[in-house]
Amino acid sequence: MQISGRFAVAVHILTCIDYFQDSQNVTSEFVASSVNTNPVIIRQIISRLKAAGLVDVSRGVSGMRLSRPTESITLYDVYAAVESVKGKLFRLNPNPNPKCPVGKNIHHALGLYLDVIQESFEENLKRVKLSDIISRI
């Protein structure tokens, strides 16, 4: 599969921002301490979240805030914002042997099922709101 760790870290970042945004200045350094990673990695992901309209970033006192209510942010929104591989979750072998009956037909035979799996995956991500995650913290 082609889902990187950025997705889970992005959800962690958004959850952290929501949890702390009214009580303290939420900076990339602060979030990095919660994620237990380098602030540079956090800033790279925040840049993608900001470009997707999920986060507002201000220098100084206010730090980061969510751009929208948590009830209107889905896991699909987060996934679409941070995953660099757009499109297919599964990669098919680009060069199956066209002279072999299996190689010649594997893309058609397998591709249909993988498309259905991906569609189901994306629909499930759209059903889960950031508020659902936050309610479990």
Question: Could you tell me what each predicted segment is?
Answer:
Residues 38-41:
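Short coil turns linking two alpha-helices in DNA-binding domains
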Residues 26-36:
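A short alpha-helical element within helix-turn-helix/winged-helix DNA-binding domains
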Residues 45-52:
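Basic amphipathic alpha-helical segments that dock to polyanions
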Residues 53-67:
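Beta-hairpin "wing" of winged helix-turn-helix
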Residues 69-137:
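Non-DNA-binding regulatory cores of transcription-related proteins
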